[in-house]
Structure formats: C-alpha cells, structure tokens
C-alpha cells in the first residue's frame, strides 16, 4: 500500500468513528424541530450550566450540533448536510477538515464555533481577508445572536479606522470573533506593547478555526508580522551600492543560485569593490555597513522580481502575497531590503525603521489551546500539519460526486511555445461560450496574458493585485456564459464560482493553468475552482521547461534537454511533448519543490524558537508589572541586583587606586548628580551600604512626593527599560538572522550560529533591562502638572 493510499485508509477509520456521532446528531433532528424558538434559544443557558456542573464539550457535542443545525435552518434557511456536520466534528477535535470548493465551509464552521464558545473563553474564525471576515460575521452572526451569543469583528471595512483599546476589548470579549490572521497577529503584538491595564485588550488565545489553513499555516508561515518603530539613521550607501552591483557580472563577480534563491559576492567581486571604494580590506569590521548594503543591493536585483514579488504603485514598492498575488498593504521588507528595492527601481528611498515587535504565523497559532483548520487542499501536507501543529487532516467526502475532468498537462519546450498554445486553446474554448478561468503564476504573467487576449479580440476581466477590491465580485461572475477571467494563483479564495444559466450544457467552467505552481496544493486549489457541488467542468495546465518551477527545482538532465532543443522549435507552431517521462518529470519536480518548501518552513521554526522564548519571557515580565505582580524585574530586586553586581565588579576587576573614580562614575551615571566624598578607607561592604543608602533616600523622597502613585512610577520605570531593550533586541535578532544565513556558505550551521549569538544577546538584554530600570528609578525627575497628572522625565 502506498503512503498516499494509506492516508485515505486512515481517513476511512476516522470517518467511521465520526459517523457514530453523526448518527446521534441526526437522531436529535426531529426533537429540535419541535422546539419553539424560545426553547431552542434556552439550550445555550442549559449547555453552559452543564459545563459548569462538570460535563465536557464532548459530552454535549451531539446535542449542541443538533441545536445549531436547527438554528441554521430557521435563521438562514440552510440545513447543514451530513458531510458538513462531519466537517464540523473534525474542526471541534482540533484538526483540519479538507473540504472541496463549494462544499459550504462557512456554514460548517457554525457548529464547532458555537460549541467551543460555550466555555466562555472565546472562539475565533480567521479568514483570508477583511471582506470575507465582515461578510461571514454578518451572515453567520445572525445564527449566534439568535442562540444568545455575542459576535465581534476584528477588522473594519474602513482601512483608515484606528480602533482604540476599548473598542478592541469589546471585540475580543465577544463569544465568537471573526477576523483575519494578520489582524489578530498585529493586535497581539500591539497588546503586548501596552503600558497599562487600560491599554490591554487581548484575551488568552483559546480556540480558532483558520480558513484556507494550508495557505496561512504553511505557505505564509515564514512571513513575520512586524511592527516597526523609530527609524534608523538614514543611510546614503544604497545608491552607491546599487551603482556598483549594476556593473557586476553574474557568476564572475557574484554567484547566483536560482534554485535555492541564494546570492553572494565572489572573490572577484570583492576585488572590484575594494578597487571601486579604494579600500584595502573589504571584510574589515569598519566596512561592515558597506558590505551589508552591497549584499542588500545584490538581493534586491536577483531575489526580488517586479510583477512577481512586488509592484510599483504611485511611487511606492508594494509587496505581493506569494500565495495569492494580492498586495500586502502596509507591509515592508525588513533589514534594509525594502530600501534596496526602492533604489533599484529609482524611487525615493524611505527611512529604514527598526522592528519593535515581530511574530511568525507559526508561533502565533501555536499559542492557541486548540487550533483547527479548513481548506480545500491540505491532505498532501498532513505530515507537516501533524509535526508543526499536531493537527490531522481529514478529507471530508463531497455531498455530490465530483464530475470535473482533470486533463494531463500539455508540455512544451519553451515559454513562447507554451504561451502561444495557451492563447490558441483559450480561443477554441471561448468560441463555444464556455466560461474560462485562466490562472497565471504572477502579476507580470497575468498582465502579459491579458495583453495577448486583447490583441486576439477576446474581452475578459483581469484579476490581480491591482484590482483586489473587486476580487470577490469578479470571481463570482467568472462562471457566466462567455466570461473569460485572468487571475493570479489563489486569487478569490473564499468566493465560489457559480455557473450561469446554460453553462452546464456547454461543459461547465474551464480552468486553464499557465504553469505548475511551487506546491501541488496550489494546483489542486486551482483545479477545485471548477466542478463545485457536482457541477461539470474541466482543468488543463500548460507548462514549459522555462517555467519558474523547472528552473528552480528541475533536475540537471531537464536543463540539458532544454538547452539542446530550445532552438529547434517554432513558437508559432508549438509542439506538445507527449512522452510519459515528461509528465513524470513535472510531477517529481513539483514534489521536490514541495519538499524544499517544507524544509524552509522547518528552518523558520528552528530560527524562530530563540525569538519565541525571548518574546514569551519579555511579555510575561511586562504583564506581571502591568498587573502589579512580582516578576524578575521587580524594582526592589533590581536595586539589590545592580548594586551587588557593581560591588562584585569592584572586587574582581578594579585596582585600588581607581576605586574612587569607578564609584563616583557609577553614582553619576546611574544614581545621582550630587556626588559626595567617599573615603579611600571604606571597605566594599561599607561602599555597598553607602550605595543602598543613596538609593533608599532618592526613592523615599519620590515616594513622599508621589504617595499612592509611587507604584505606577516604579512600573513605568521598569516597563520603559524593558521596551527599550526589547526593541533593540528584536531589531538585532533580525539583522543577526541575515548574517547567520550567509554563514551557511562558510560550512557553518546557520541555525546553531544564530542560537549561539542570540543566547549571548539575550543575557546582555536582561542585564541592560536591570541597569536601565535602576537608572530610570533613581535619575528620573517626577512631578505633577497643573491638572494633577503624574509627569515623569527619564534621563
């Protein structure tokens, strides 16, 4: 039995167990139907009482699902199918339900969300974009409110709206919250920058269902969510670095490996840089900023492609989501890469800002007590789901048989051949009136196909990053007779394509893929656009040896075949390669690409573990201070630790003749500007007591002035120190990762190098927090303004 078949054998066993619960739910159908609205609504109070009295969610699961099912029918006019109930049970168990496009994932989620919200700890559904979150909260929210639960929406249709803490607290205190993954991530980071209880709003992360789980939990897992703060000193090296890199010759001055997306300066390039800048030693410590900027410029030119990784819009670089081609509004690449791309495109170079806080989706979602996912394509990545999130992937049977035909790929030697063949095929299908969804792998390619269709006189809609606002509407209309829609991969996920009148008779929706994507899951998602709910349709992919997939992950023999045959073909007379070995080649290359993606995501987890441990430590200490609890940064403990450490330093490293100078310097830098005479004859114990006396006098004076506000002052002093040190640490760790990754070429383990340096930096950060808190407590000036508000001036 193959691994693929064994997965589905395992699914049968899982579904057999779920069938027993389904039978119980179905047996309650008539009973629920006889209840009045008031009696059905009263079930929510009953369930909550039963949970308080010791029953578990599993104990009330069948009855709760039956209640929601009946509520769905009364409120929405929709009664969940058996397969949707099974999907809901999978979600309640904290697993991923693989449900085909059009099978009703939105309705499926109502049952597990209601059940898990009954505990009063919150339940969330996280969608792919704000439009879907608002739409689903509005529609499904009617059911929850009917049953007495509150519903919050974590996003707004007004992108300019800046919600305050009170508004967000109201949202997150709701029984059920609809939001997006990115909104949740940024809210989490902002909440942990709060300096008082009144500014905090985020509850403990309890239960969440992630829509399009494979795209968010896997494909976007390496993308960090970053909150940027104060800018660095503006660099003038981007322009000069860009000028030099433009003069470099590939594989002579620098090495570029497209397959592994690696680029670095070779020895010849180093010599050119030394000659250009008139410096004797390129890698000397004093040249580190120059080296950094040259590497950034090299990355900007070779690793980031306009129309694929970003677009230029109104003089700004806007990043594209690799999974769907959408613009990532408000997102910038960190570490200077964004500025290097701006210089490459001859735009105004924006200030390079420091990262104040960051988190990856992986670490964000692993904080939930229970996590579930919905997707149309997750089965092939079940191993990774289990390893990273401890989530099984259960394939849910379709309510109606799938009637879509998936044709074998049409394979061509060159890109021009493939493009010509694709356009000719579109013409043939369009002549029949059958609607077409033509999917390109990048914004650049979608625009190219759009131009060629215009030249061919074929009217169509172009759906890519430039027109994301109309995305749902355009996708929804893509099934009308004669419609041709050109889209980027994954665009419109979450919106069904419904067939127009008479389209079934024409053969349903035709999905035409213009290249194999880097992951098999993406191709399956594209195919799944056609054939929803038993509709007829077909999918056909056109591929070539010049596609990104083959260039980046193809075997050497395939590259040799291309070089040998590329000049033998006529683009206007494309010839498809029919041999089985070529079909097998593209399948195996995609599997290799999937493996590389999984490996890269695994390395992200390894890298991010240091940041995660430090983040947890810092946030825990911040929350302890805000809540008035004692932590490692209790001001009283810090004074004792800092003074004791200084005395130990005097005892071990300072000569006797320098003793007075060191003590005075310590007092002046950390405690007071009023220096008093210190006798050379004082012992270290006497010096220690003397320093404690100074600290006690300063704090007593501030305590007398502040009275009941003294505790607020202590917390503020410590929080400010923590935040300053943590911002520096986050920024440093981001830079460190870039450096550590580069060390891989020097036969060093980049993860080991990173963790080693990160641990050193972590200890330095903790020491700096203690010392800065000490300074904040003693050197700060405090007073009350004319309104009676506490004012603190930190030196």
Swiss-Prot record:
SUPFAM superfamilies per the UniProt record, alphabetical: Helical scaffold and wing domains of SecA, P-loop containing nucleoside triphosphate hydrolases, Pre-protein crosslinking domain of SecA
A Gene Ontology molecular function term of the record: ATP binding
Main location: membrane
Keyword vocabulary terms for this entry: ATP-binding, Cell membrane, Cytoplasm, Membrane, Nucleotide-binding, Protein transport, Translocase, Translocation, Transport
Keyword ATP-binding attached: yes
BP terms from Gene Ontology: intracellular protein transmembrane transport; protein import; protein targeting; protein transport by the Sec complex
InterPro entries: Helicase_ATP-bd (IPR014001), Helicase_C-like (IPR001650), P-loop_NTPase (IPR027417), SecA (IPR000185), SecA2 (IPR022490), SecA_CS (IPR020937), SecA_DEAD (IPR011115), SecA_motor_DEAD (IPR014018)
Positions of ATP binding: 84, 102-106, 496
The keyword Translocase appears for this protein: yes
Cysteines engaged in disulfide bonds, as pairs: none
GO cellular component: cell envelope Sec protein transport complex; cytosol; plasma membrane
E.C. designation(s): 7.4.2.8
Topology within the bilayer: Peripheral membrane protein
Pfam families: P-loop_SecA, SecA_DEAD, SecA_PP_bind, SecA_SW
Subunit structure: Monomer and homodimer. Part of the essential Sec protein translocation apparatus which comprises SecA, SecYEG and auxiliary proteins SecDF. Other proteins may also be involved.
Similarity comment: Belongs to the SecA family.
UniProt-listed PANTHER family: CHLOROPLAST PROTEIN-TRANSPORTING ATPASE (PTHR30612:SF0), SECA INNER MEMBRANE COMPONENT OF SEC PROTEIN SECRETION SYSTEM (PTHR30612)
Role of this protein: Part of the Sec protein translocase complex. Interacts with the SecYEG preprotein conducting channel. Has a central role in coupling the hydrolysis of ATP to the transfer of proteins into and across the cell membrane, serving as an ATP-driven molecular motor driving the stepwise translocation of polypeptide chains across the membrane.
Protein name in UniProt: Protein translocase subunit SecA 2
């Amino acid at each position: 039995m193959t691994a693929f078949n064994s997965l589905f054998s395992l699914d049968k066993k899982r579904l057999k167990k779920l069938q027993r619960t389904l039978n119980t739910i179905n047996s309650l159908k008539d009973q629920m139907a006889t209840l009045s609205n008031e009696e059905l609504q009263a079930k929510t109070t009953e369930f909550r009482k039963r949970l308080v009295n010791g029953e578990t969610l599993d104990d009330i699961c069948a009855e709760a699902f039956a209640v929601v099912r009946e509520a769905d029918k009364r409120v929405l006019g929709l009664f969940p199918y058996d397969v949707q109930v099974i999907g809901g049970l999978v979600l309640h168990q904290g697993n991923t339900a693989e449900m085909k496009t059009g099978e009703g994932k939105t309705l499926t989620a109502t049952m597990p969300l209601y059940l898990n919200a009954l505990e009063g700890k919150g339940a969330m559904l996280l969608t792919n974009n704000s439009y879907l979150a608002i739409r689903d909260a509005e529609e499904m929210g009617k059911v929850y409110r009917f049953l007495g639960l509150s519903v919050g929406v974590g996003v707004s249709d007004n992108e300019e709206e800046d919600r305050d803490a009170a508004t967000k607290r109201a949202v997150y205190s709701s029984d059920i919250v609809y939001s997006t993954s990115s909104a949740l991530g940024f809210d989490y980071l902002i909440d942990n920058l709060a300096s008082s209880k009144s500014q905090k709003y985020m509850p403990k992360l309890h239960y969440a269902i992630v829509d399009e789980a494979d795209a968010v939990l896997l494909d976007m897992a390496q993308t960090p969510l970053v909150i940027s703060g104060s800018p660095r000193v503006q660099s003038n090296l981007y322009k000069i670095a860009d000028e030099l890199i433009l003069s470099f010759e590939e594989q002579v001055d620098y090495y570029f490996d497209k397959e592994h997306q690696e680029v670095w300066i070779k020895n010849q390039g180093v010599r050119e840089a030394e000659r250009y800048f008139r410096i004797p030693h390129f890698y000397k410590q004093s040249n580190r900023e120059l080296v950094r900027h040259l590497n950034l410029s090299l990355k900007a030119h070779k690793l980031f492609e306009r129309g694929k990784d970003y677009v230029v819009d109104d003089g700004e670089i806007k990043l594209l989501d690799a999974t769907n081609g959408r613009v990532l509004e408000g997102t910038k690449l960190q570490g200077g890469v964004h500025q290097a791309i701006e210089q490459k495109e001859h735009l105004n170079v924006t200030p390079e800002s420091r990262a104040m806080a960051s988190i990856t989706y992986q670490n964000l979602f692993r904080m939930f007590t229970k996590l579930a996912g919905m997707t149309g394509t997750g089965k092939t990545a079940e191993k990774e789901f289990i390893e990273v999130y401890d989530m099984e992937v259960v394939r849910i049977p379709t309510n109606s048989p799938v009637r879509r035909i998936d044709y074998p790929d049409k394979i061509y030697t060159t890109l021009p051949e493939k493009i010509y063949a694709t356009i000719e095929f579109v013409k043939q299908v369009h002549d029949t009136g059958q609607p077409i969804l033509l999917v390109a792998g990048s914004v650049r390619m979608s625009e190219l196909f759009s131009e060629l269709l215009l030249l061919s006189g074929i009217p169509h809609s172009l759906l890519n990053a430039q027109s994301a606002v109309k995305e749902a509407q355009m996708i929804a209309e893509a099934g009308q007779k004669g419609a041709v829609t050109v889209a980027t991969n994954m665009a419109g996920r979450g919106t069904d394509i419904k067939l127009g009148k008479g389209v079934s008779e024409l053969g349903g929706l035709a999905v035409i893929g213009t290249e194999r994507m880097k992951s098999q899951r993406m191709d399956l998602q594209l195919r799944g656009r056609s054939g929803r709910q038993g509709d007829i349709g077909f999918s056909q992919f056109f591929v070539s040896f010049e596609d990104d997939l083959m260039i980046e992950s193809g075997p050497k023999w395939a590259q040799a075949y291309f070089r040998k045959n590329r000049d033998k073909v006529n683009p206007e007379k494309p010839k498809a390669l029919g041999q089985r070995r070529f079909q097998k080649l593209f399948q195996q290359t995609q599997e290799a690409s999937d493996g590389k993606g999984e490996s890269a995501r695994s390395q992200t987890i390894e890298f991010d573990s240091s940041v995660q441990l430090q983040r947890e430590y810092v946030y825990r200490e911040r929350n302890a201070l805000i809540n008035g609890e004692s932590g490692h940064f209790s001001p009283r403990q810090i004074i004792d630790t800092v003074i004791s450490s200084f005395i130990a330093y005097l005892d071990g490293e300072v000569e006797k003749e320098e003793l007075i100078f060191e003590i005075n310097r310590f007092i002046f830098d950390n405690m007071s500007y009023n220096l008093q005479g210190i006798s050379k004859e004082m012992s270290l114990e006497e010096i220690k007591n003397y320093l404690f006396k100074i600290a006690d006098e300063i704090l007593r004076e501030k305590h007398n002035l502040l009275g009941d506000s003294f505790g607020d002052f202590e917390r503020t002093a410590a929080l400010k120190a923590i935040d300053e040190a943590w911002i520096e640490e986050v920024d440093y760790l981001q830079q460190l990762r870039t450096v550590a990754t580069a060390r891989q070429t020097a036969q060093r383990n980049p993860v080991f190098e990173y963790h080693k340096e990160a641990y050193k930096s972590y200890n330095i950060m903790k020491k700096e927090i203690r010392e800065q808190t000490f300074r904040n407590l003693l050197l700060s000036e405090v007073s009350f303004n004319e309104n009676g508000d506490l004012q603190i001036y930190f030196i």
